[in-house]
Regions:
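C-terminal catalytic/acceptor-binding lobe
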Residues: 154-261
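N-proximal low-complexity "stem/linker" segments adjacent to membrane-targeting elements
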Residues: 1-20
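Short beta-strand/turn micro-motifs composed of small residues
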Residues: 7-9, 40, 88
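Short, hydrophobic beta-strand segments that form beta-sheet elements in well-ordered domains
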Residues: 32-43, 112
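Active-site-proximal specificity loops/subdomain of glycosyltransferases
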Residues: 38-82, 96-97
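Conserved catalytic core of nucleotide-sugar-dependent glycosyltransferases
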Residues: 66, 84, 88, 92-166, ...
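Short, acidic, metal-binding catalytic loop of nucleotide-sugar glycosyltransferases
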Residues: 18-34
């Protein structure tokens, strides 16, 4: 199975540092079946691809993420052969070995990701609206082909992941859960294929997590991985308030996810 990972990049010094961390860790030498592309906006009317970076003709800021996504997928559809397209960002770690050997978990006629619920009402989307989080959208060819027909200007002011979920839902696609680990949410490292390492409080912590998680997955033995797992947790304890409450919240969240699948 051929996989293309499209990472939303740009938007400031912090994102630049996160991208560099990705380039020297998990994305440094991907297997031939997996291609990693960083996606940026630029002035002008042309698409430019260089050094695994795709520049698309739109603004390179937070409010243009949906437009950038649509243009990026449009280019990939025309220039790459793939079975699975993953849209993500620069603060996410992917275990490419697991990704490359876990083909059976991906439903190419549906859309995969991690479900979340909105915390407030956003236009016609009520509080509690259930959607796939944008840090990992797993799209087969049918879904990616549908997305390039999406008109981004009809979703102004709506978060890109809610807009994408709503559009694909109205197009008749079904959705399925792909578990991820979010270190900033509960500070407990679960070695999944996708690990969200973003820190909202300390920019340097995102990079430290990227490095530590990468070292874990490079371990060749159980003891090596155990010791490196401990290093990840020690880093979380040092940099955050890891408590029994956070562990309890993590377990409750996992239980709720299973009930909602």
């Amino acid at each position: 199975m051929k996989v293309t990972i499209l990472l939303i990049a740009g938007g400031g010094v912090i994102h630049e540092s996160d991208e560099l961390a990705q380039r020297r860790t998990w994305a440094n030498n991907p297997p031939p079946e997996i291609e990693v592309i960083w996606l940026r906006g630029r002035l002008g009317s042309e698409f430019v691809y260089e050094n695994n970076t795709l520049f698309v003709p739109c603004a390179n800021n937070f409010s243009s993420i949906l437009e950038k996504t649509i243009l990026g997928i449009q280019w990939v559809e025309s220039n790459r052969s793939f079975d699975l397209l993953i849209r993500s960002n620069t603060s996410t770690y992917f275990n490419l070995t697991n990704l490359n050997h876990g083909h059976s978990r991906y439903k190419l006629d549906s859309v995969g990701g991690t479900f979340e619920t909105s915390r407030k009402t956003i236009y016609s989307y009520p509080k509690g609206y259930r959607y796939l989080n944008g840090s990992g959208l797993y799209l087969g060819r049918a879904a990616s082909s549908a997305l390039i027909r999406m008109k981004y200007d009809e979703f102004q002011g709506i978060p890109d992941d809610i807009a994408i979920h709503s559009y694909l839902d109205s197009a008749g696609f079904k959705f399925y859960e792909i578990p991820r680990n979010n270190l900033d949410l509960h500070h407990i490292f679960v070695p999944r294929t996708q690990v969200r390492v973003k820190s909202w409080s300390k920019a340097e912590l995102t990079i430290a997590r990227m490095d530590l998680v990468h070292e874990y997955f490079q371990g060749n033995s159980f003891l090596e991985r155990l010791s490196r797992w401990v290093m990840v947790e020690l880093n979380e304890i040092y940099n955050s308030k890891l408590s029994l409450k956070s562990i309890n919240n993590y377990l409750i969240r996992q239980l709720n996810n299973k009930r909602n699948i």
